[in-house]
Amino acid sequence: SMEFGSRGTTESIADMNPDDIESISVMTGAAAAALYGSDAANGAMLITTKKGKAGATQIQVSSNTEFMNPLRLPDFQTRYGTGRKGKASGSTIHSWGAPLNQAARYNYSPEDFLQTGHILTNSVTLSGGTEKNQIYFSTAAVNSKGLVPNNKYNRYNFTFRNTSNLLNDRLTLDVSGSYIIQKDRNMINQGVYSNPLVSAYLFPRGDDFSLVKAFERWNPARKIYEQFWPQGEGGDLRMQNPYWIAYRNPRENSRKRYMFTGGITYKITDWMNVAGRIRVDNTNSLYTEKLYATSNPTLLENSKKGKYTETRGEERQTYGDVMLNLSKTFKEKFSLDAHIGASIKDNRFDELSVYGPIAGAPNIFNVVNLDKSQKKTPKTGWHEQTQSFFYSLELGWKSQLFVTTTGRNDWASQLANSPQKSFFYPSVGVSWLPSSTFNFPEKFNYLKIRASWASVANPFPRELTIATHPYDDTISGWDDKSNYPIGQLYPERTKTWELGFDARFLHGFTLSASWYRADTYNQT
């Protein structure tokens, strides 16, 4: 929610070591959907990773250091002091009190809360091999400290790739593996309650910020440190001392991810080959959130001793395909590029959380120290599988006129118990290169005119067509009531017409423009 925010972790693409990337390209339109399924209905980003090169072994070492400071912050008023409606108040988060004279101004800026961040990146790569076998290995470490106090990010990458050419170069084996360890603390999210920037930005201009830097005070009666924040919670904002949020409401993620990719290609003729691939991508994660005693009561569920959350997740992604590829030119006029294949995608996710207020000794963060009567143990999980058949066919004439058609049929598990067990999405396109037909000037050397029609489908969300029984934490069991299945659901479909052109001119400038119309049906 907007109030509580999220865990603030990174996207999976951020796990990659930039030094392992050879190139990045973008595939758009129906071609992306035909080869990669409905997940690529809006396009696909293709990342090609490096592999070994024949020749002497090469070792590259790189080190990079970056420092970070905010480029610009919002402008804040410093004319009015602590209070509301022009009246001074001694304990409030508002800064619209009585006007301040120059001597009473502390000249506070949110930049006083921020710190200079840095990113240290170190990597080592090794590459080499023979004409028949090439290897590539890399390791990298990213260690970062953010702008917000107690914000850290550490990632360690290990990558290996081996490419072999066998049977007189007719058989190619390509195997790679990656292992990624990531640990982060207090990644900033968009919520209010767990975001220290809210109270740092709204700190009253008539108060002395240096006083709240000592964010906790020792309570000899309770024998614990308590939060110091005389400004109050600001009503529904539930604000706390920003340093208390950073150091006494820590959120930590620990992820271990390993990926394996294996590919085999057999060249039947010079213009035909068959290829198979398998990719496994597994992630184990641990998320913890520690809320110390005297944090905001709303977050603590009115506990006087603190609250603890521990979530363990497991994600399993498996993909495999087999494809027949043809690329041939006939009589130096006609060309044929075709891909025919089948694929399977299997995704699984399981997550178990344990959270609740602390019942025993304050600020001892362990699941055995939680209040048994209020402890929650929600478990979530799902399993999806899509089996597909696809093709892509392009006919060319003199490398200037092309007709393309694609098609894909998906059997998705989300369609269980629905009237339609699979869905087919085709496309047709025509493109012409006037720059190849006519003699264009050197300064305007490329022009492509294109037109296409495509019909792309997506399955509806899982579990809509089957009865489900939600887990009820209040009774520590399954609810007798079930979510009634929706029977008459059909896959979402978008039909698109597109006209456009691509041009290159003046030795490096490119221009692309498109007109399109898209109509979507069966939205859920």
Which role does the model predict for each range below?
Residues P18, Y36-A41, N151-N154, E442-N445:
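Short, glycine-/polar-rich solvent-exposed loops and beta-turns at beta-strand/coil boundaries
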Residues M2-T28:
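Short acidic/polar hinge/loop motifs at secondary-structure boundaries
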Residues S427-S431:
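Outer-membrane beta-barrel "beta-signal"
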Residues A40, G128-K132, A141, S164-N168, ...:
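A generic beta-sheet turn/junction motif
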Residues A54-Y106, L147, N151, N157, ...:
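Surface-exposed loop/interface segments of Gram-negative outer-membrane beta-barrel transport/assembly proteins
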Residues P18-Q60, I119-T121, V142-K145:
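A beta-strand signature from Gram-negative outer-membrane beta-barrel systems
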